[in-house]
């Protein structure tokens, strides 16, 4: 029974029933509950009725087997059943049915669970079998694929080897054809190259040694091209080309060498043409110089002849004067004797005193001093010779980019000149001077040097001088102190490049001939507009003459720069020699007050020169300069008043009065101290 109960506890119905069958064969009495007397014995004893058994609670939904209620009596078929027994029997049967039903439910649940577990095991087994089959099929498939791949690799390797053999044979055929074509192409280029090379060599051999030196660079380049072409031909003949493209490259290189040789021939011809033109220019310049020397010699002879004639005339006049004096003395002596004899009391008439008559001023003496005129002509002649010399460079269209590079190399550092610091001024000067010294200079399109063209030095000198003069219209007009750093750089270049100073003066004199000083006279038949152009007036965009105030402003800037150049010192490293000293300012003032005054411009320029140079002139010349100021105030100003009654003349009068009253002139603002840079 214990085994049956354990089996019941384990919900193993089959084992429970089997154990119950075994127990029922050996069971002879009651197997559950306490030992009691039979019900009929208890009934005879009239024992009280046992209480009805309590109904057992309904089974829990957790499928537990309900326990049968305890019955105190045991039915017997021999006894007459009573109501209590019947009820107990009914209850027992119901409980039994309920227990059976619960057992059936539990058995069904167990069977369902077992079926589910069996199905799960079968499903898992089928799945495992299917996976094993799949793995076996996959392994088989992989083996088959590996076999196929091996076979395919073997076939592919064989095909590839065959294709490689075919390609190698085909490539060898193509290489042979390309080699043959390259030989033919290079041979054609070689014939062209040799013909051109021999022609250039004949040209160079026909030149004299001096001309060959001009083409030395081209000669070296010709030799290099010949060597490179020979190397290319030998390389093609030997077939030293690993790639097919190299055969084509060899033909292209041969063509490039031929083109380079053509360009070299053109360069040599151009260089020879330029050299020939330069020789012609030199011959022309020498001829012009000879003509100029001859003209000057004739002019000197003419001047000497005129001086000799004037001297002879003066001697004749002196001789006539002496003869007249002697005859007059004799007449006086005779008259005196007659007077003494005839009229002793009559006094002799007084002889009138002769007055000194100044010599008549010629047109030249009222316009310019002869020495200054000669200096002016020499400066312009030098300027014109340089302008004529650089025309080939200036007009050649192929050199436009080079001219632009030269302009950038000059304009950028020149526009940056200022007295911000000595280092800044020296840095911009060094950029300009290094370019003139032949150092490579970076520009927008690369690097250039002044030695790239034989005429570049004169061209750049003219360009820089013109750029310095143009600063009078921009920087110096708006800022008078800016004239002094520009003047210091100009003086330094003047010391290092003497021709630059003369070219600079030529541009200054072209813009303002009054700086000579030269008051150009109006020619007969010349219109007022034409005359104003000759003294520096410009035409506006509307083809009209500029206004007088604009003209005076520009002339003031020119005079300020001119005066600043006179008193400025150059860089210490450039040397102590002065090339445009203070006596130039003294000469200008002395000559300016002896030429014909012009309205506005004469007073404006004198006032600007005095304000800029007055301090240095007073300190250097002292009383002589004071006498010059007094002469300007007392002699020149009345002459100027006959032509000018405008504002510049009034301001000059006030300035002279202030200088003479205070007995000093303040130093110009912005003058660089000695040794500034």
Swiss-Prot record:
Keywords: Coiled coil, Cytoplasm, mRNA transport, Nuclear pore complex, Nucleus, Protein transport, Translocation, Transport. Residues 122-179, 280-346 form a coiled coil. It comes from the Eukaryota. Disulfide bonds: none annotated. It is found in: Cytoplasm; Nucleus, Nuclear pore complex. Residues 34-48, 294-340 have a biased composition (Basic and acidic residues). Residues 49-60 have a biased composition (Pro residues). The keyword Transport applies. Belongs to the GLE1 family. This is mRNA export factor Gle1. The lineage of its organism: Eukaryota, Metazoa, Ecdysozoa, Arthropoda, Hexapoda. The gene is Gle1.
């Amino acid at each position: 029974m214990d085994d049956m109960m354990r089996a019941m506890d384990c919900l193993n119905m089959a084992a429970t029933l089997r154990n119950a069958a075994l127990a029922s064969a050996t069971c002879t009495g009651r197997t559950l509950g306490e030992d009691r007397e039979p019900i009929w014995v208890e009934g005879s004893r009239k024992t009280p009725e046992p209480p009805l058994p309590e109904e057992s609670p309904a089974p829990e939904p957790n499928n537990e087997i309900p326990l049968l209620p305890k019955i105190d009596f045991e039915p017997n078929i021999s006894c007459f059943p009573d109501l209590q027994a019947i009820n107990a029997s009914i209850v027992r049967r119901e409980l039994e049915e309920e227990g059976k039903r619960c057992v059936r439910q539990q058995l069904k649940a167990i069977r369902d669970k077992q079926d589910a577990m069996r199905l799960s095991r079968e499903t898992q087994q089928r799945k495992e079998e299917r996976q094993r089959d799949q793995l076996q099929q996959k392994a088989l498939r992989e083996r088959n694929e590996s076999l196929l791949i091996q076979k395919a690799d073997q076939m592919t390797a064989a095909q590839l080897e065959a294709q490689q053999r075919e390609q190698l044979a085909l490539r060898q055929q193509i290489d042979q054809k390309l080699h043959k074509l390259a030989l033919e192409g290079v041979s054609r280029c070689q014939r062209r190259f040799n013909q051109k090379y021999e022609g250039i060599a004949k040209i160079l051999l026909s030149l004299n040694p001096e001309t060959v030196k001009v083409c030395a660079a081209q000669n070296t380049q010709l030799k290099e091209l010949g060597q490179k072409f020979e190397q290319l031909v030998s390389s093609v003949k030997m077939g030293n080309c690993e790639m097919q493209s190299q055969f084509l490259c060899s033909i292209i290189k041969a063509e490039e060498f031929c083109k380079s040789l053509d360009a070299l021939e053109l360069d040599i011809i151009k260089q020879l043409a330029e050299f020939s033109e330069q020789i012609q220019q030199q011959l022309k310049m020498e001829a012009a110089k000879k003509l100029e020397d001859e003209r000057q010699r004739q002019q000197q002879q003419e001047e000497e002849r005129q001086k000799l004639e004037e001297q002879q005339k003066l001697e004749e006049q002196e001789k006539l004067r002496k003869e007249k004096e002697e005859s007059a003395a004799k007449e006086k002596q005779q008259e005196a004797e007659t007077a003494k004899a005839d009229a002793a009391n009559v006094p002799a008439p007084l002889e009138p005193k002769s007055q000194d008559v100044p010599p008549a001023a010629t047109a030249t003496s009222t316009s310019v001093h002869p020495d200054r005129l000669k200096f002016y002509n020499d400066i312009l002649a030098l300027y014109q010779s340089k302008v004529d010399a650089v025309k080939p460079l200036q007009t050649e269209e192929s050199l436009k980019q080079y001219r632009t590079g030269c302009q950038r190399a000059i304009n950028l550092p020149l526009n940056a000149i200022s007295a911000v610091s000595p280092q800044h001024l020296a840095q911009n000067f060094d950029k300009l001077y290094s370019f003139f010294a032949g150092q490579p200079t970076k520009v927008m399109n690369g690097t250039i040097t002044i030695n790239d063209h034989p005429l570049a030095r004169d061209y750049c000198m003219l360009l820089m001088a013109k750029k310095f003069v143009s600063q009078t219209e921009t920087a110096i007009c708006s800022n008078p102190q800016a004239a002094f750093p520009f003047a210091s750089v100009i003086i330094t270049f003047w010391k290092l490049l003497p021709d630059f100073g003369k070219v600079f003066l030529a541009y200054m004199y072209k813009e303002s001939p009054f700086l000579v000083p030269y008051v150009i006279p109006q020619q007969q038949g010349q219109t007022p507009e034409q005359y104003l152009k000759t003294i520096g007036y410009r035409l506006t965009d509307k083809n009209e003459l500029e206004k007088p105030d604009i003209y005076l402003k520009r002339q003031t800037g020119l005079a300020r720069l001119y005066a600043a150049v006179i008193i400025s010192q150059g860089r210490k490293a450039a040397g102590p020699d002065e090339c445009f000293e203070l006596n130039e300012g003294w000469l200008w003032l002395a000559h300016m007050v002896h030429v014909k005054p012009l309205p506005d411009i004469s007073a404006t320029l004198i006032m600007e020169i005095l304000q800029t140079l007055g301090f240095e002139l007073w300190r250097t010349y002292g009383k002589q300069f004071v006498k010059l100021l007094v002469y300007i105030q007392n002699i020149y100003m009345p002459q100027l008043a006959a032509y000018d009654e405008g504002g510049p003349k009034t301001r000059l009068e006030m300035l002279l009065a202030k200088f003479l009253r205070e007995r000093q002139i303040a130093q110009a603002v912005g003058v660089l101290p000695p040794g500034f840079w």
